[in-house]
Amino acid sequence: MNGIKYAVFTDKSIRLLGKNQYTSNVESGSTRTEIKHWVELFFGVKVKAMNSHRLPAKGRKVRLIMGHTMHYRRMIITLQPGYSIPPLRKKRT
């Protein structure tokens, strides 16, 4: 499934990690139930709630045609207490 693009690490998302909330960018065509099912299946966790919002589109001009570059939205996934998503990469020594 190509629903989740990548995890987001901003000041806000790092602060939300303490509340057991994980932030990631997902494709705009994916639904909440698809993302919830995929996260529960792939990571083996229970999702408590999901919030999503679209980021403001950035314009890009190619000659005379104006287009947009943002084709995703941001999901904040709250897990039930006792569950956590392991880090995707281990630190190399």
Curated annotation (Swiss-Prot):
Chief subcellular location: plastid
Gene Ontology CC terms: chloroplast; ribonucleoprotein complex; ribosome
GO molecular function: mRNA binding; rRNA binding; structural constituent of ribosome
GO BP terms in the entry: translation
Localization: Plastid, Chloroplast
Keywords assigned by UniProt, alphabetized: Chloroplast, Plastid, Ribonucleoprotein, Ribosomal protein, RNA-binding, rRNA-binding
Subunit structure of this chain's protein: Part of the 50S ribosomal subunit.
Biological role stated in the UniProt entry: Binds to 23S rRNA.
Family as reported in the entry's similarity comment: Belongs to the universal ribosomal protein uL23 family.
HAMAP family, per database record: Ribosomal_uL23_B (MF_01369_B)
Name used for this protein in its record: Large ribosomal subunit protein uL23cz/uL23cy
Species of the source: Lotus japonicus
Gene: rpl23-A
